[in-house]
Amino acid sequence: MADQLSSGMGNLSIDQQPPSGPQMGGQGQMRRSYIPPHLRGKMGDAAPPMAGPNGLNNSAWAGNNNYDARGPGGGGNWPAPGGPPGPGFEGQQGAGWGGPRPQGGFNPNAYRGNAGAGAGAGAGGGGGSFSNRGSGDGQWRDGKHIPGPANPRVERELFGTPDDPSKQHTGINFEKYDDIPVEASGDNVPEPVLTFSNPPLDNHLISNIQLARYNVPTPVQKYSIPIVMGGRDLMACAQTGSGKTGGFLFPILSQSFHTGPSPIPASAAGAYGRQRKAYPTALILAPTRELVSQIYDEARKFAYRSWVRPCVVYGGADIGSQLRQIERGCDLLVATPGRLVDLIERGRISLCNIKYLVLDEADRMLDMGFEPQIRRIVEGEDMPKVNDRQTLMFSATFPRDIQILARDFLKDYIFLSVGRVGSTSENITQKVEYVEDIDKRSVLLDILHTHAGGLTLIFVETKRMADSLSDFLINQNFPATSIHGDRTQRERERALEMFRNGRCPILVATAVAARGLDIPNVTHVINYDLPTDIDDYVHRIGRTGRAGNTGIATAFFNRGNRGVVRELLELLKEANQEVPAFLETIARESSFGGGRGGRGGGRGGGRGRTQTADYRKFGGSGGGGFGGGFGGAPASGGYGGGGYGGGGPPAGGYGGGGGAGYGGGGGGGGYGGGGYGNPGGAGGQSWW
């Protein structure tokens, strides 16, 4: 190309030739330079002097020509002698291309992918080592945990500022949590802790808790911290918004900071010391993408500046980026069951080093049909057996079938029931309005005009209604967005982010956002469509009144919702809320054969004791059950009056006899003695 350029220059006329002279670096010799067509024939000022052969040594590429000409900021952006440095990250050792060159030759540790070596500074901008892990990395060196340096930018990202509306802070009723009753059953239950202190917690974790501006442990944290730190398994029920996530993250991270990483099997190391398969020591399973993302964000907060690297995997997102994240190191893994099974099948995750297994919202995972995947993960892969790991189950509700499932996953566990689980917080003011379907939109507009300000979460039953209602509100000049299962993960995350930061203070959602999501500072929850299950209602309104803050929950009720009227009445009375007269009237109508009977049958069954009590104490009790039936003549039965009872878990589970089966026939056992009964046939036959 240079020859072509030279030959081309030879064809230029003399008046187009550049002048010679010392200013061109040629000491009187002719140097030909290319002149653009629009400048040809014009005599201009001489070009600035360019020292060195070919005029390169004063450019940003000078170092490529002459190694010794480089300035002190080596690495990728080599500055010109006497010129400004390259655009590296100023002041950061090895964090960018402008960092200093490595001293003393090649450092093989800088290229390793483990948590200890190379977790500090990068290799002088050479790019071989991954940079600090974003949350500020510490190291595990010589059996000690060495926290990394503070990073103000990352701290603002993780913890926000005191007046940041997107971060949850404790509210005015937070101290009332001390009045919530707590029941712990099991052998040798440890005493609760009253403060975040050492012991039992690690000092570095306490500093991160202080950065998050958490001052006092919630009731579930007061009990779960000493239980988990003592090596015990735990099944915990807690009122929504009570700090369940901290209840398992605090003790797991504290113990990890003390004990350090588990050794990776010798066969696992790949080329250059970097393995493709991850060996996490803690696994947290949750049912939805939003919930695992939320838990991951909390884990990043409390693992800040530590050696522990949290990772998150879930379906509906690019698996390639998740694999790259895992390859960079994964000590604490938050996952949905389906995506985790996929990664295990790909050979990218091993569970052989798991010390802590957490099932969050376990009842919801079973409701969504994840039991086969959960059993495969826990029992069918290389996870240590129940006696070689700690297992924790957390949820807002624990129906009896979940408690029985715990026999397979937990050992000598402590059952913790905090507050009225399956009930609601008194921080939430519940209002039930009688609204026919055709009037719902106009009533909704009245409410939104009346309660302007704050974040409002509106729950509907169908995806189509979510989009339709959000479009209607936008046309009425209300800034709204929607979230449901048909939206892509990127769209869902964007909608949640706009809702959190207040750009769209109205969010219309289906049940996908109802369970476990911690959306800070929601002041009003509206059940535009009431759910058919009272537990779903509990979880929906639990999105407000969190961490001691107050909130309002409004429900649109009509005779189409009479299936939940009895349970709704009981719920309002438990939480000391106003009970409208029309609810009492419709409840009386339902009791005369119209609607579904109560699930309670007294306090013996239904949402009461069986949802919150330790079945090991009450496993043999019958009574109640789903009593009442769907209504109708005794011959057609309904749910039957036999009830949960039975002979304790080993003898037959849901127990039985008595009453009709699910829809017909008489007699019939429970789960253990003949199943639910066969509709239209003899009750002794089983569906199972």
UniProtKB/Swiss-Prot annotation:
The GO molecular function terms of this record are: ATP binding; ATP hydrolysis activity; eukaryotic initiation factor 4G binding; G-quadruplex DNA binding; G-quadruplex RNA binding; mRNA binding; RNA helicase activity; RNA strand annealing activity
Enzyme's top EC category: hydrolase
Q: Where does ATP bind?
A: 238-245
Task: Please list the coiled coil stretches.
Answer: none
Provide the alphabetized UniProt keywords: ATP-binding, Cytoplasm, Helicase, Hydrolase, Initiation factor, Nucleotide-binding, Protein biosynthesis, RNA-binding
Bias type Gly residues, positions:
88-102, 115-129, 592-608
Reaction(s) catalyzed by this protein?
Answer: ATP + H2O = ADP + phosphate + H(+)
Q: What is this protein called?
A: ATP-dependent RNA helicase ded1
Q: Which organism is it from?
A: Neurospora crassa (strain ATCC 24698 / 74-OR23-1A / CBS 708.71 / DSM 1257 / FGSC 987)
